[in-house]
Amino acid sequence: MTKKQENETSKELGMDNKKTSGKSGKLKISVSAIRKGEKKTEGKRSNTRRRANNHSNDHSKRRRPAAQDLLKDLKQKQRADEARLDQESKAAKQEYKKSLNKAEASESKPVVKKVESVEKPAETAAEAPKVRGPKILKPSPARLKQNQANSEKPAAKPSSSRRPSSRPSFTEAPMPENKEGRRRKSGKPGRKGQNSYADQGRGANSNRSEQRKRKNKKHQSAPQVKKQVTQRKDRPLPESFEYEVGMNAQDLGKILHREPAEIVKKLFMLGIMINQNLSLDKDTIELLAADYGIEAVEKVHEDISDIDNIFAQEMEESKNSENQVVRPPVVTIMGHVDHGKTTLLDRLRHTRVSEHEAGGITQNIGAYQVRINDRLITFLDTPGHAAFSSMRARGAEITDIVVLIVAADDGVMPQTIEAIDHAKSAGVPIIVAINKMDRPGANPAHVTEQLMQYELIPENYGGSTIFVNISAKTGMGIDELLENIILEADMLELKADPKQKAIGTVVEARLSRGKGPVADVLIQQGTLRVGDPIVVGDTFGRVRTMTNDKGHQVKKATPSMPVEITGLNDVPESADKLVVFADEKTARAVGEARAQQSLQKQRENVQHVTLDNLFDTMKRESMKSVDIVLKADVQGSAEALAQSFQKIDVEGVRVNIIHSGVGAINESDVTLASASNALIIGFNVRPTATAKSQAAQEGVDIRLYSIIYKAIDDVKAAMQGMLEPTYEEKVIGNLTVRETWKVSKIGTIAGAFVDNGYVTRESGIRVIRDGVVKYDGKVASLRRFKDDVKEVKAGFDCGLTIENFNDIKEGDELEAYEMQEVKPS
């Protein structure tokens, strides 16, 4: 074997110098010496590094002043030691090469025994686990041939189970043994924590890596048992299921007892591409249910914020309740203004309410209960003025019977017709009371004929409408009217369930300084108690106090009973529905949700400028407007005033209601009016002391009214005052030119005679020649003889000049005129 082959063989097999005979013993000694030198060198290096690190760490902890100098000296000493050890290592390598050459020269054919490694049975690729570690090289063809040749010889004792190192062969000398025959770790004996491969330059974690390797080998040898995954048993499909729009495959999988992947696959087969988290629409869910052969029912959520729906459900439930009892009828008195509605109510209640009303007219809805013998009747008094149309409509909606008051001496009037229409639209029976029969000019037959034109036919004429002649002032016919009201109520069979949750309707609402938001409510079903959590329109709260129509506080309100309640967070609107909830938390959530919905509707109602309404918008913006901050005592009056102001028709001017509310005029109202240059109108309210002084300082005009038509007239006058003044030409005199003079620096002077009327120094003048207007201008100067005069009347001569005109001739006619302002109608 050549030297080159021997070197290759020794590198591949890792020479076992223990079994080499002859001079190879010297080779073993020299290799061991080299290894000892290297270990010693490596140990010194590691000790030097350790000492340097420990010294550096201790020095940094103690913060000695000369730490940097000591560290520098240690580094220099370490570099010197490393250089010396490198020289010793090179010398040892050279000595080893020389001894190897001598051994080859002395023996013509060195005996090299193959060291066979203990090979484990081959594992299949499927069984062999993946272990992180060094890459194992595939043996070369030369090594395979050598393995076959040596397999015939007796096997040598394996040196190690470690894989051959790729380092030079001189490092493959056997490890030194201790007295017990065990291999001891490299490095200094007795030192703990030294790496077993420190001489090969491995890191501090090599022990851990070796432990992992041994562990992995154990796992390789042990048979691997795969864990069996428990298969999910498919439960049977339900016959039907409830779904919500927006559910995904995971949600449906839980309901249908199927994997989401199966849902996705089935929809894919149906031509619908989805993933597990995609929200599904109604059609997709129903298509999936049809494919499975089951029924899909959409789940309907009840909107608790829809109190109108709750109100209707409660009313329907009360009709089928077993706890129904007879309730008092609700009677609304309607008619034209000054026909005696409130006077009739005063007669029934034995009060004098009409004497205390401003202007003698009712301007809000009043609710009262009157006991007739052993029966209670609830009366609603509605305004008769044209401005209170919405109030009359609300009164007709919550009533059971309408008593239509018509004055016998006045007959059917516009508000009478309107009241008839409201009652018919609400489907409420009408009882006609022809009032003021004590007047000399009373003519009930004429009134009956008028009402028959509106399909109100009396019973004696074959109709079904009850007619009663009364006098609210003297009390004539009042008992007959009450008997007919009770008879009509018995025919209607009015009942209610007092044990259910209360529902009602707001008759009026206002803001009281001492009580806060106050609402007059008519209870229609159930019983309202103090402390009940309620929602009223867009407001919510808990009933704090309840006061009846006589001013007494009560603990509960039964059906058909009008009460004044407090405890709301804001002033509700008239005709808002009242609903009682189980707890205050739910009531608050519903009230806040409704307030948010109302705000959203207001935003949606804002009209945006488009090409279609651009012209109307420009026209509206070019119009002048009267800005008003409106405050009233009750919500119904504020609503009626706002509607009346909007109906005022003055060409070129419109009313802009900046803010409308209830309660006293406060500082915020004055600040708002000052910022927007608006007028404050108060109806049955007064400004606070601070608001009054602030308005005086900022020059804000506050107008206070107690009669609605006076407020309407003043606003109309203000609108007319904002119009540009219009002028009309008026001829005031005629003159004839008798003589002319031309004067330098002055021009032509006309001597004229005033035929009729008069001429002034500020009047306009026209020069007419042969029936044609030659010039239209102004009088420049007017004199009589040598005196300047302001006016010359008919029958007198005068001299005058015309501005910028000198072509005046004898015989010309002069026409004097002036522009007069025309007041808007």
UniProtKB/Swiss-Prot annotation:
Region (G4): 435-438
Stretch list, region G2: 360-364
Basic residues bias locations: 181-191, 211-220
Domain tr-type G stretches: 326-495
Cross-referenced InterPro entries: EF-G-like_DII (IPR053905), IF2_II (IPR044145), IF2_N (IPR006847), P-loop_NTPase (IPR027417), Small_GTP-bd (IPR005225), T_Tr_GTP-bd_dom (IPR000795), TF_IF2_bacterial-like (IPR000178), TIF_IF2 (IPR015760)
Pfam families, per database record: EF-G_D2, GTP_EFTU, IF-2, IF2_N
Top-level taxon of the source organism: Bacteria
Region (G1) location: 335-342
Molecular function via GO: GTP binding; GTPase activity; translation initiation factor activity
GO CC annotation: cytosol
Renumbered residue ranges of the record's region G5: 471-473
Ranges of compositional bias, category Low complexity: 158-169
Gene3D superfamilies, per the entry: P-loop containing nucleotide triphosphate hydrolases, Translation factors, Translation initiation factor IF- 2, domain 3
Region (Disordered): 1-239
Biased composition (Polar residues): 194-208
Binding site for GTP: 335-342, 381-385, 435-438
Region named G3: 381-384
Keyword annotations of the record: Cytoplasm, GTP-binding, Initiation factor, Nucleotide-binding, Protein biosynthesis
Positions with biased composition (Basic and acidic residues): 1-19, 35-45, 70-98, 113-122
Cellular location(s): Cytoplasm
Family: Belongs to the TRAFAC class translation factor GTPase superfamily. Classic translation factor GTPase family. IF-2 subfamily.
Function according to Swiss-Prot or TrEMBL: One of the essential components for the initiation of protein synthesis. Protects formylmethionyl-tRNA from spontaneous hydrolysis and promotes its binding to the 30S ribosomal subunits. Also involved in the hydrolysis of GTP during the formation of the 70S ribosomal complex.
Name of this protein: Translation initiation factor IF-2
Organism listed in the record: Lactobacillus delbrueckii subsp. bulgaricus (strain ATCC 11842 / DSM 20081 / BCRC 10696 / JCM 1002 / NBRC 13953 / NCIMB 11778 / NCTC 12712 / WDCM 00102 / Lb 14)
Organismal lineage: Bacteria, Bacillati, Bacillota, Bacilli, Lactobacillales
Gene: infB
